[in-house]
């Protein structure tokens, strides 16, 4: 269950008016949802509730799983200082260890409907802020 209004309220409660966020995520967040209503989508609600201006960075389409898997694995293998806090992020660690792919290489969320969502967040983060890593790495290696 996700309640975007509660999430925004929790962010406001934690940070007040003293914050600068850059928001990214799933391209499907641009879709209207029956859960939201009023012809809104999640990103419009986030922008309005958090009073954001130009801090929204959402791809037109989600990255392909196979491409983001290569990017994610490359970042972890080439940046050994990239560490995920085991105490603070136990569910992300579990996703990274145990989420499986289906025959077409996509995350198999049918095996466990509670797994895979946080690895998606990590994929979207890497895709939004580090998508040029492989190109830069390959250029530096030449």
Question: For the regions a protein language model found, what residue spans apply to each?
Answer:
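Mg2+-dependent endonuclease catalytic cores in nucleic-acid-processing enzymes, primarily RNase H-like
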Residues: 1-109, 132-133, 139
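Phosphate/NTP-binding elements of NTP-utilizing enzymes
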Residues: 21-25, 108, 116-126
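Intrinsic low-complexity, intrinsically disordered terminal tails and linker regions enriched
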Residues: 118, 141-142
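Short, hydrophobic alpha-helical segments
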Residues: 125-133
